[in-house]
Amino acid sequence: MRLSRHFLPVMKESPADAQIVSHKLMLRAGMIRQTAAGIYAWLPLGHRVLRKIEQIVREEQDRAGAIELLMPTMQSADLWRESGRYDAYGPEMLRIKDRHDREMLFGPTNEEMITAIFRDNARSYRDLPRILYHIQWKFRDEVRPRFGVMRGREFLMKDAYSFDLDIEGARHSYNRMFVAYLRTFRRMGLSAIPMQADTGPIGGDLSHEFIVLAPTGESEVFYHTNWEVERALDVDVDDVAALQGFVDGLTADYAATDEKRDPAREAAAGDSLKQSRGIEVGHIFYFGTKYSAAMGMTVQGPDGQPVTPQMGSYGIGVSRLMGAIIEASHDDAGIVWPDAVAPYTVGLINMRADDARCAAAADDLYAKLEAAGIETLYDDRDERGGAKFATMDLIGLPWQIVVGPKGLDKGVVELKRRATGEKVELSVEDAIARIAG
């Protein structure tokens, strides 16, 4: 994509009301614009990153055996009355009436709807186990939306729901998602720590939050320093015993949110205990028959008797992840995108758009990068070199290639790695090979 044809409204200064780094940089980099309190339009650059994050989430859900569907944002209030949560949920749930005076709501979560769908369509134990998921926009009427996409009122979520015949099967589904989440966040360049967590309004007996450490995080967290060492995640999720042993081994190291602190385990950790702040990017729950029983869901068991399925739910904040990645990966100049989620792989800078030789060389290099399948943002604008460098550093693409008169005299281009600042002069062919890696 040529920057001269792109829609990239970058800002030199941060708006006064932007409080945290990710909010400031997303606005400055032309990724989002606020349209109402806690509601944002996703501009082209931000939308590209959002789609890449979403695709990684989707691939790891599929890999874990989950099946994708899509549920609507609007839900009937009657479903929530069945579960008993309609009156209990609170003012965060936006309630409306349609023209026929039927009570509706913007879904803040989907336990009721997925339970109704499964209840009305699953008949036998042969329909279990199943994990169903969707990626959909949600709305929660936060009393004080803040921090940009980190705590907005409208946000993109991945929600998965498991249905199992017994507790053992439900725990296996839970463990599948536990590992899938660790793999998901690692692919995005994040180190997420699974922490024992409060179940909140979702309910249930077992819950983990996945926390990315950041000074701006809203959660106070406590963990063993062993969590600072990257763990191998090459376990067979279909092997029930091996997977349970793997999860037990991981969670043997203490990690908990403030609500679930364990003084005895903290004392045992001794000097290895750390206290920090973190950002919640995922939350998983096992809640047994809380919703299936309340909504009358049964299937015929192997012995012909009705069985109430065991359930779990598994959420990832897809849009929130973008803010978390920026909080974890930035410097004074701007964003530093991990390769897997960067909007483009390389930023190509023509230092002299008014120089016919530079323009021809940059155009040729752009064509070669595109032919090699390398996503490229080509700054072909007639701007000062300093402004072009500042824009590229701000938007944080993993690589920068600079084409200028001095380099052309030597038959080289300058290649810069954004994360390290390392610069090397290479031939065009070698630069492309280095990026393609």
Swiss-Prot record:
A Pfam family: HGTP_anticodon
Stored NCBIfam families: PRK12325.1 (NF008979), proS_fam_II (TIGR00409)
Lineage: Bacteria, Pseudomonadati, Pseudomonadota, Alphaproteobacteria, Sphingomonadales
Gene encoding the protein: proS
Similarity field: Belongs to the class-II aminoacyl-tRNA synthetase family. ProS type 2 subfamily.
Keyword ATP-binding: yes
Name the record gives this protein: Proline--tRNA ligase
Catalytic activity field: tRNA(Pro) + L-proline + ATP = L-prolyl-tRNA(Pro) + AMP + diphosphate
InterPro entries: aa-tRNA-synt_IIb (IPR002314), aa-tRNA-synth_II (IPR006195), aa-tRNA-synth_II/BPL/LPL (IPR045864), Anticodon-bd (IPR004154), Anticodon-bd_dom_sf (IPR036621), Pro-tRNA-ligase_IIa (IPR002316), Pro-tRNA-synth_IIa_bac-type (IPR004500), Pro-tRNA_synthetase (IPR050062)
UniProt keyword terms in alphabetical order: Aminoacyl-tRNA synthetase, ATP-binding, Cytoplasm, Ligase, Nucleotide-binding, Protein biosynthesis
